[in-house]
């Protein structure tokens, strides 16, 4: 952005997380036993409750959790959002640090935001609808994250649930 050339977008830019958020939705659904990894859900190209579709409108047929995550299937994760509910999504997003600063030792870090009925009521004075839960389940709606928050969330998954606070080192004393 030529009007803000010195903004550190890694810590201060806030963007919809999109499909990586499906990891949080899936974690919530599995942990709350709203789905098993083996359960098959049929994707006809749109959800059966609300006309919410896959990005390209494609129908992917029968999918279990692993295949849905690998294909980044919106319809499957709309259903996980439906089963978990917005309260569950908000809770699990908080476990992964969504809507909170990472604590990096840099000035200007943004906290992002997790979509919720309370946020919508506060900002827009409007009711929450199921379609917004579906959007939140796939990382859209009012959810905003910094690139660093997404990196921390994904590293937590890669590290088996161990979350490390990021920091900028001033020096490295030795290679060990």
Predicted regions and their residues:
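Beta-lactam-recognizing serine transpeptidase/beta-lactamase-like catalytic domain environment
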Residues: 1-19, 24-176
């Amino acid at each position: 952005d030529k009007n803000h050339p010195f903004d550190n977008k890694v810590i201060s830019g806030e963007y919809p997380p999109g499909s990586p958020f499906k990891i949080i939705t899936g974690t919530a659904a599995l942990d709350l036993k709203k789905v098993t990894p083996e359960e098959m859900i049929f994707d006809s190209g749109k959800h059966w409750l609300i006309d919410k579709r896959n990005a390209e409108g494609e129908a992917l047929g029968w999918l279990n959790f692993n295949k849905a995550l690998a294909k980044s299937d919106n319809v499957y994760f709309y259903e996980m959002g439906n089963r978990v509910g917005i309260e569950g999504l908000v809770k699990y997003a908080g476990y992964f640090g969504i809507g909170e600063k990472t604590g990096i030792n840099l000035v200007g870090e943004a906290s992002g935001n997790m979509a919720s009925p309370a946020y919508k009521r506060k900002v827009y004075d409007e009711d929450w609808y199921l379609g917004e839960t579906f959007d939140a389940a796939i990382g859209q709606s009012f959810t905003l994250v910094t690139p660093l928050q997404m990196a921390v969330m994904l590293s937590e998954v890669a590290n088996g649930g161990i979350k490390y606070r990021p920091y900028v080192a001033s020096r490295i004393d030795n290679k060990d």
